């Protein structure tokens, strides 16, 4: 028996962490592909192309409401273009400024069109985020209205407050700059754009999905997304400055470059969303007990039935705590939702919506793609000395198993037992 030493313990722990990281990265890549994030980024790119000017126009309109903020519109625009667009996209920023200035002179009908375009942009973003988090339905009614109204109205005003504060801090830096011999203030102001990006991405991951997202996960995801975004920005600017796009496209080079930049930006943002969603579910997925799909489905349906008796629903993480892997639950939930055995609430939780007295085990197995194959005896087996006896025994087993699989789930679960004897709901 090998003795444990600090070196072997460190090596074993390092290998465990490495395997955890490899599994987590594999899950992120698999989820990124399964959620069709590249396709979603393409659709959001075209939507952004149409909605950028309306969003800028709405921002100007909200600034004009408060006299103290009326002069901040151009400053905010320059700030966004400086820290969001690569350094080589001056043409795009100039075009967007001109388009926005012309849009502010539209009639009320044109203004309604701009607001609708901005609304559709936000709706499309929520739809793609809900798809990543596995939420079947987006916000509806008053919740939907309040969210988008807050973004379109309060968002620009909060940006104005932040910009006014930054102006004050800039003045403060000029005032005390001579006393900052260590250059601390200069370092702080150098990373202010990073902090703003971090806050924006974190808020995006927390507020947009129609489900509860842990703030600490959103903070980690927002930080990594900010780092990836800044790296992408630097790499993109370097590639453009060392390429011959202008020679090929001439005066039209700005448009394909802008589309490419927006598409890559959305790919980074959606990748960050996949990362945030995967943190908790990979941790839970480590408890995977490798249940067969039929047994896992029965386990989920049983707990959902017990939850319904209590007037409750079950969240996705509660279901994963039962011992299912993330991949297995995504596969089973798609089939159970498609057969209307379960349903998803507006909050993203799951409820049972099927009469268990009408659903048999064999039907459930067929729906989830695991129809039972009954044992049989082939010709070679019959020629063996014990072949005929085995055929009779296996035939009896076959009949008994067939009768068992024809049981309804209500009979299988014996749902008339006392509620107190039910296993506790996973917490």
From Swiss-Prot:
Location of this chain's protein in the cell: Cell inner membrane
Transmembrane feature ranges: 49-69, 106-126, 145-165, 188-208, 220-240, 256-276
GO cellular component: plasma membrane
KW rRNA processing (keyword) present: no
InterPro entries: UPF0761_bac, Virul_fac_BrkB
Lipid bilayer topology: Multi-pass membrane protein
Keywords recorded for this protein, A-Z: Cell inner membrane, Cell membrane, Membrane, Transmembrane, Transmembrane helix
Domain of life, source organism: Bacteria
Chief location: membrane
Family in the record: Belongs to the UPF0761 family.
Protein name: UPF0761 membrane protein CJA_2282
Organism phylogeny: Bacteria, Pseudomonadati, Pseudomonadota, Gammaproteobacteria, Cellvibrionales
């Amino acid at each position: 028996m090998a003795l444990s030493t600090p070196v072997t313990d460190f090596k074993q722990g390092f290998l465990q962490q490495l395997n955890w990281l490899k599994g987590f990265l594999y899950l992120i890549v698999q989820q990124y592909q399964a959620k069709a994030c590249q396709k979603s980024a393409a659709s959001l790119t075209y939507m952004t192309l149409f909605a950028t000017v309306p969003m800028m126009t709405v921002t100007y309109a909200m600034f004009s409401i408060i006299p103290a903020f009326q002069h901040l519109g151009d400053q905010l625009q320059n700030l966004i273009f400086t820290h969001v667009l690569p350094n080589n996209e001056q043409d795009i920023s100039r075009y967007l400024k001109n388009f926005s200035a012309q849009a502010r002179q539209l009639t009320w009908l044109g203004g309604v069109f701009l607001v609708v375009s901005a609304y559709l942009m936000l709706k499309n973003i929520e739809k793609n985020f809900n798809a990543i988090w596995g939420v079947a339905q987006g916000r509806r009614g008053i919740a939907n209205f309040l969210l988008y109204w807050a973004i379109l109205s309060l968002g620009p005003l909060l940006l104005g407050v932040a910009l006014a504060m930054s102006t004050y801090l800039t003045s403060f830096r000029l005032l005390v700059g001579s006393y900052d011999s260590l250059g601390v203030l200069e370092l702080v102001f150098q990373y202010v754009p990073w902090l703003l990006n971090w806050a924006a991405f974190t808020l995006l991951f927390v507020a947009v999905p129609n489900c509860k997202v842990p703030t600490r996960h959103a903070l980690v995801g927002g930080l990594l997304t900010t780092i990836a975004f800044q790296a992408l920005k630097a790499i993109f600017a370097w590639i453009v400055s060392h390429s011959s796009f202008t020679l090929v496209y001439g005066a039209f080079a700005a448009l394909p470059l802008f589309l490419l930049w927006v598409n890559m930006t959305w790919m980074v943002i959606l990748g960050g969303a996949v990362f945030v969603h995967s943190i908790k579910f990979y941790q839970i997925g480590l408890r995977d007990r490798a249940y067969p799909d039929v047994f896992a489905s029965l386990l989920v349906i049983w707990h959902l039935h017990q939850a319904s008796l209590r007037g409750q629903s079950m969240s996705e993480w509660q279901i994963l705590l039962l011992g299912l892997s993330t991949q297995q639950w995504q596969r089973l939930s798609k089939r159970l939702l498609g057969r209307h055995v379960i349903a998803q609430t507006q909050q993203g939780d799951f409820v049972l919506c099927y009469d268990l007295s009408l659903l048999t085990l064999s039907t459930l197995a067929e729906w989830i793609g695991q129809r039972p194959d009954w044992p049989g005896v082939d010709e070679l087996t019959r020629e063996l000395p014990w072949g005929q006896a085995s055929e009779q025994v296996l035939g009896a087993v076959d009949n008994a198993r067939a009768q068992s699989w024809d049981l309804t789930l209500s009979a299988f679960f014996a749902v008339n037992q006392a509620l107190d004897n039910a296993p506790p709901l996973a917490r």
